[in-house]
From Swiss-Prot:
The gene is Arfgap3. Residues 222-233, 349-363 have a biased composition (Low complexity). This is ADP-ribosylation factor GTPase-activating protein 3. Residues 10-126 form the Arf-GAP domain. A zinc finger (C4-type) spans 25-48.
């Protein structure tokens, strides 16, 4: 016995898949299963087929119904005698309703069903051999091939059938002319005359000629079925109606539509006119309010800009802001002097002097802004040099006043020297000397030498000394008495750095004053 061909396999599985119970998976119920268990003759999905493979071939032998082509006749008979419906009924009869794959196919019911499928497939193979279909599943009856329809033959058959129907019912069709012929004879003749019998001698060929049309049959059939009911959808006979009246009615309807359109258009025009009237009234109200308030030009502009006192005031109840509006002009402000947190050295007194100069310049700037602006921006390059000359002549006080210098010890404190009143004495005293020092000029050389010798003699017995011991300074200085000279290092380049800072600060102050004046001129007035 040879193996089945591919066409035989496809034909058998096509027939088996057409069964509704075989269109879903036997285990999970998924649609369109493409795998099969030969041991049980059931159809499975690809996921359930994997779980069946893990059970082993001794429990379930899996094959694909689409990919595998080496099926044997015994395997095909197993699928034919099995099926999802037979397997489910057998398992239910034996009380196996579990969903667990291992428990289900290792049960006693699964073992009995495997043996049953094997026995039935062996018997079918011996009995039918290589036949495709078994007795239980015979081949479906072959449907006859569709015949080609002839268009002209079909129309000819319709005409023949219509003629036979007309000839089959000659009596109802011929009764109508006979009745029409007898009625006038009754009116024309007397009551003794009988009906005419001329139509009886004529052959029956004339009747089909008069009743051959299908249109005359329909009223007779409609009368039989529907009768003379009111509101029917059948055709009605036209009475004597005048078309002039219909035309007049149509014209009346057209005129009515035109009138409705005109009536709809008038409210729109009225609404437009009313809106224009309201706009004019609003303008008149605003004009009256302006006349009543008597606002000047500047106050009116400010009121319009702020949106106050127009349209929202209720007469005699609410308060109008414009009645109490006053124009406030800014006077020259007095700038408060900032408090100094730290004390300064005479060397660093520039910052205090520059602040005073900026205050004076700002006040003078506000008094005459145009003159100062032109003077500042015309002499931009020379402003720093001229400023320092003015500063030295205008504000000499910070150079001599220093609040923190009194807290220093007498040894390191810079003494307040008074210049020699008479310059002739200095010229007489140092006229022939090539070089002199400040100590020689002020006569303090002997005093400093005496203090230094006394201090060294006092510390001669000590093993080590410090700078604080040498100059009699206190160990700890108070936190509030720090000076800028104690913070900044005493380096030779610090003088140049201070000079650069002073020049930059002067230029920035001049530029800031010019900017502030331009802003106040533009936005202040």
């Amino acid at each position: 016995m040879g193996d089945p061909s591919k066409q035989d396999i496809l034909a058998i599985f096509k027939r088996l898949r057409s069964v509704p119970t075989n269109k879903v998976c036997f285990d999970c119920g998924a649609k369109n299963p493409s795998w099969a268990s030969i041991s049980y003759g059931v159809f499975l999905c690809i996921d359930c087929s994997g779980s069946h493979r893990s059970l082993g071939v001794h429990l379930s032998f899996i094959r694909s119904t689409e990919l595998d082509s080496n099926w044997s006749w015994f395997q095909l008979r197993c699928m034919q005698v099995g099926g999802n419906a037979n397997a489910s009924s057998f398992f239910h009869q034996h009380g196996c309703a579990t969903k667990d794959t291992n428990a289900k196919y290792n049960s006693r019911a699964a073992q009995l069903y495997r043996e049953k499928i094997k026995t039935l497939a062996t018997q079918a193979t011996r009995r039918h051999g290589t036949d495709l279909w078994l007795d239980s599943c015979a081949a479906p009856p072959a449907s006859p091939p569709p015949k080609e329809e002839d268009f002209f033959a079909s129309h000819a058959s319709l005409e023949v059938s219509g003629a036979t129907q007309a000839s089959a019912q000659p009596e109802p069709a011929s009764s109508t002319p006979w009745g029409l012929e007898t009625t006038p004879e009754k009116h024309e003749g007397g009551p003794g005359q009988g009906p005419s019998v001329e139509g009886l001698n004529t052959p029956g060929k004339t009747a089909p000629a008069e009743v051959s049309s299908i249109i005359k049959k329909k009223p007779n059939q409609a009368k039989k079925g529907l009768g003379a009911k009111k509101g029917s959808l059948g055709a009605q006979k036209l009475t004597n109606t005048s078309f002039t009246e219909i035309e007049k009615q149509a014209q009346a309807v057209d005129k009515r539509k035109e009138q409705e359109d005109l009536a709809r258009g008038t409210p729109k025009e009225e609404s437009i006119v009313s809106s224009l009237r309201l706009a004019y009234k609003d303008l008149e109200i605003h004009k009256k309010q302006d006349e009543r308030l008597n606002l000047s030009g500047q106050k009116k502009a400010e009121a319009e800009r702020l949106g106050m006192g127009f349209g929202s005031c209720r007469g005699g109840i609410s308060h109008s802001v414009t009645s109490d509006m006053q124009t406030i002009e800014q006077e020259s402000p007095t700038l408060a002097k900032p408090r100094r947190k730290y004390q300064e050295d005479p060397e660093d007194s520039y910052f205090s002097s520059s602040s005073k100069w900026s205050e004076q310049s700002s006040s003078r700037y506000f008094d005459d802004p145009m003159e100062l602006r032109s003077s500042h921006f015309s002499s931009w390059d020379d402003s720093a040099d001229s400023y320092w000359k003015k500063d030295s002549s205008r504000d000499p006080e910070p150079a001599t006043k220093s609040t923190g210098s009194s807290d220093r010890p007498s040894s390191r404190r810079k003494p307040e020297y008074e210049p020699v009143g008479n310059t002739d004495e200095a010229q007489k005293k140092f006229g022939n000397v090539k070089a002199i020092s400040s100590d020689m000029y002020f006569g303090i050389q002997s005093q400093t030498d005496f203090e230094t010798r006394a201090r060294l003699e006092r510390l001669s017995t000590s093993s080590s000394i410090s700078s604080a011991d040498l100059f009699d300074e206190q160990r700890k200085q108070t936190t509030g008495n720090y000076n800028l000279s104690n913070v900044l290092p005493n380096a030779p380049d610090m003088a140049q750095f201070k000079q650069g800072v002073r020049s930059v600060a002067g230029k920035l102050s001049v530029f800031a004053n010019g900017v502030m004046t331009s802003i106040q001129d533009r936005y202040g007035s």
